[in-house]
Amino acid sequence: MARDAELARSSGWPWRWLPALLLLQLLRWRCALCALPFTSSRHPGFADLLSEQQLLEVQDLTLSLLQGGGLGPLSLLPPDLPDLEPECRELLMDFANSSAELTACMVRSARPVRLCQTCYPLFQQVAIKMDNISRNIGNTSEGPRCGGSLLTADRMQIVLMVSEFFNSTWQEANCANCLTNNGEDLSNNTEDFLSLFNKTLACFEHNLQGHTYSLLPPKNYSEVCRNCKEAYKNLSLLYSQMQKLNGLENKAEPETHLCIDVEDAMNITRKLWSRTFNCSVTCSDTVSVVAVSVFILFLPVVFYLSSFLHSEQKKRKLILPKRLKSSTSFANIQENAT
């Protein structure tokens, strides 16, 4: 058997070089054609080499040779070189489909920002697909090493570039602050805030229904300010609590923000409340500060006034001179005698 195989290889070696020789000759023809000066579609000397139809056939044959097809077993290149292994191709297509879905979700959720609450399942899916590619490095030496061929086979490293873009966007939006620890669902605080946010917007819309048929925008939003005051205060209070909780959990990073969905929702509500509706809510902290300031201002007055009223008032005693005493006593004696 070994001898037969050796004979087959020795007898078939010229056929392996036939495509190379043919391709070399075709390239020489093309170089000769390119070197010819021409000013029109039919230039002198062109018919001596190849006609236009033959030139097209040469181009098609050259392309077929370069792609490894069209000649069957006589192909220059291995048939599997331009394409990936089936397993690697499947992993790449899974990542491509997941990336396309996540990209579409991110763009649709750009304004108003609903990135974290809408796209977190798709982000988890992309992370899983990327992890599958990274882990698939081939169990044996003969197995497909998809991680290397898909991630680091070229200078561009497009798969890694796309994955890093998603990760950096997710970190910039701080979506982890809106999700649970495993990132599979929204946190309780986020759900409560979004519920209050929707109720506040519904209150705004309900109290504006009477002005929808007016051609000019209304200038008086007293109904909105009066009826939605409690909802707005509850939303602001919950947002402040979430900020304090986030500050306690991230003492090492004092500038850590809440997730972009919560921040954008609160910014929208504040703009509607203060700029559009021109509503104002008296802050309880301001009242307390003013009261304490007035008390401290009048404290010295109260202190001096109370000390003056409750201090012991000593009566002044006049000391008469001796001469005055003797004269007064003598006058008294004369009065008694008369």
UniProtKB/Swiss-Prot annotation:
Keywords from the named record: Glycoprotein, Lysosome, Membrane, Phosphoprotein, Signal, Transmembrane, Transmembrane helix
Compartments where located: Lysosome membrane
Summary of the tissues where the protein is detected: Expressed primarily in osteoclasts and melanocytes as well as brain, kidney and spleen. Found at lower levels in the thymus, testis, heart and liver.
Chain coiled-coil ranges: none
Summary of subunit composition and partner proteins: Chloride channel 7 are heteromers of alpha (CLCN7) and beta (OSTM1) subunits.
Protein role: Required for osteoclast and melanocyte maturation and function.
Protein name: Osteopetrosis-associated transmembrane protein 1
